[in-house]
Amino acid sequence: MDDDRARELLARERDRIEQALAVRRDDPLEGDDRIEPGDEGSEDLYQDTFDAARIADLDEELAAVERAEARLAAGTYGLSIESGSPIPDARLEAVPAAERTVEEQERFDR
């Protein structure tokens, strides 16, 4: 994959993640002293827990994009961090921040 295409894909991925983070972090009730902790129902607690987990996932996705951008700058984007093998362009199109081939990722995730 050429560098311009990689930059475009990574920029789009960064934008998607940053927009999702902005939505998750934009809580209009945050800091509202009129709401007592006991007023929040269990549904709110569940949603807060879900949002915190989603924010953590998005933060990790953003970190992966930043690592991919660093690899692009270093000239190693598109090569597996595990084996140095080329990551197929189709995988990079689908997952621009991919760090491993599909097979390596499956082993890593086990």
Where are these regions (language model features)?
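Interaction interfaces in information-processing and related assembly proteins
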Residues: M1-A74, A94, E103, R110
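Residues immediately within or flanking Cys/His clusters that coordinate Zn2+
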Residues: Y77, A98
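Short cysteine-rich clusters marking metal-coordination/redox-active sites
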Residues: S80-S83, T101
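Short functional micro-motifs and their immediate structural scaffolds
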Residues: P86-P88, D109
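Short, non-ligating residues that shape and space the ligands of small metal-coordination modules
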Residues: D89-E93
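The DNA-recognition helices of helix-turn-helix-type DNA-binding domains
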Residues: E99, F108
